[in-house]
């Protein structure tokens, strides 16, 4: 099976609330590609749903290293920090997410407005 197959399998397990099976599938995907951003994000979110916030933070940090321009990755990590009660860290990471969002908006072509 490919990393995408394991990721999709993990998503199916997650949807069925089989979180341990989802974690196992995401880890298999990451065995194929340690920087597979979709699997890292899904794994972090699954850990958060299991209330394993320390693991969610650890994987969230890996996700940001793997996908440094992904504003959703920063937003998720900020939420994990909030869940842990690390408000200063959450605010710092949330600011980075906002900055990435602004950069994205500024780089998008402007569509002319009709009068």
What does each model-found stretch correspond to?
Residues 1-5, 109-114:
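TPR-adjacent "capping" and linker segments in tetratricopeptide-repeat scaffold/adaptor proteins
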Residues 2-28, 32:
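Alpha-helical segment of the N-proximal tetratricopeptide repeat
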Residues 15-27, 50-62, 84-96, 101:
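Structural signature of tandem alpha-helical TPR/SEL1-like repeats
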Residues 28-50:
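Short, charge-rich amphipathic alpha-helical segments embedded
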């Amino acid at each position: 099976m490919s990393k995408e197959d394991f990721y999709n399998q993990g998503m199916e397990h997650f949807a069925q609330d089989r979180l341990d099976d989802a974690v196992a599938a995401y880890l298999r995907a990451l065995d194929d590609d340690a920087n597979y951003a979709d699997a890292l994000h899904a794994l972090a979110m699954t850990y958060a749903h299991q209330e394993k916030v320390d693991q969610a933070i650890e994987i969230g940090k890996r996700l940001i290293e793997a996908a440094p321009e992904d504003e959703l990755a920063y937003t998720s990590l900020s939420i994990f920090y909030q869940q842990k009660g690390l408000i200063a860290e959450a605010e710092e990471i949330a600011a980075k997410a906002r900055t990435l969002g602004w950069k994205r908006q500024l780089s998008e072509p402007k569509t002319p407005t009709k009068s």
